[in-house]
């Protein structure tokens, strides 16, 4: 009986220890040297198991956050307004982003849907929005380039960005990576005037896509939604002044670009 009790206590102790090991957050990836201004980007996926730890982010020195607002013309992140407001209340620079769906066409409609759900304040803490252009996730049943030719894809992107710029008064930012951008756009070089946020999970600065001579933000580490506080990690290429330059009051509005001819796409 005593032996059985001892074995039971041992087994329970191991179970508790195992659960603690699983639940203990892994240390976040080290911020690259020479890039002092760090931030995060989040979506509804980051709420699957844990709340967003805004106080912890401020304590670790996080200075900005991007929050996913929409995708396509039908999905709006249910956590967007709460996360956006919490980040602002924590004193962070905050921006919104949209996950583009080239496979669904209607780039102007997608841009307008995004603007109808995002929060815009022309102050010194609201960051220019970005358009997420990357590989389709597992639930999107297309090839890596959304079943589009480079000409079709770049036409979609131009129409999307033109609509945002016309309505916002300044160029939006593009989020992408060289490994997707170059083959899917055919090494198109016509987007270099836009600020770019590059995903590159390495210890050295990201490889630039065709058309760019520098980057604005570097996403240097991916998040893991199974770990508390482990979010996508970013740094600004520069210092605090470069982050502030992405806020509304730091750049004078630019003239709206001319609308491009209507763009359509076949149904997938």
Regions found by a protein language model. Name each.
Residues 94, 170-172, 196:
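Hydrophobic anchor at the start of a short beta-strand
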Residues 31-44, 50, 189-268:
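Functionally critical loop-and-helix segments that line ligand-binding/catalytic clefts
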């Amino acid at each position: 009986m005593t032996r059985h009790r001892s074995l039971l206590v041992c087994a329970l102790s191991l179970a508790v220890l195992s659960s603690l090991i699983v639940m203990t957050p892994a240390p976040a990836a080290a911020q690259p040297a020479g890039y002092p201004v760090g931030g995060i980007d989040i979506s509804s996926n980051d709420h699957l198991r844990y709340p967003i730890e805004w106080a912890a982010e401020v304590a670790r020195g996080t200075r900005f956050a991007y929050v996913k607002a929409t995708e396509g013309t039908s999905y709006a992140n249910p956590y967007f307004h709460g996360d956006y407001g919490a980040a602002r209340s924590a004193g962070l620079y905050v921006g919104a982003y949209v996950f583009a769906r080239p496979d669904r066409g209607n780039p102007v409609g997608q841009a307008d849907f995004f603007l109808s759900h995002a929060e815009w304040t022309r102050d010194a803490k609201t960051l220019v929005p970005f358009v997420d252009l990357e590989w389709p996730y597992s639930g999107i049943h297309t090839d890596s380039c959304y079943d589009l030719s480079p000409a079709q894809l770049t036409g979609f992107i131009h129409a999307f960005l033109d609509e945002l710029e016309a309505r916002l008064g300044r160029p939006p930012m593009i989020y992408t990576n060289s490994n997707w951008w170059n083959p899917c756009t055919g090494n198109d070089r016509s987007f270099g005037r836009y600020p770019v946020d590059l995903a590159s999970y390495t210890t050295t600065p990201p490889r630039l896509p065709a058309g760019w001579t520098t980057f604005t933000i570097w996403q240097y580490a991916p998040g893991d939604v199974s770990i508390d506080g482990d979010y996508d990690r970013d740094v600004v290429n520069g210092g605090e002044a470069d982050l502030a330059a992405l806020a509304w009051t730091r750049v004078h509005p630019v003239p709206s670009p001319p609308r491009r001819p209507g763009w359509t796409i076949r149904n997938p």
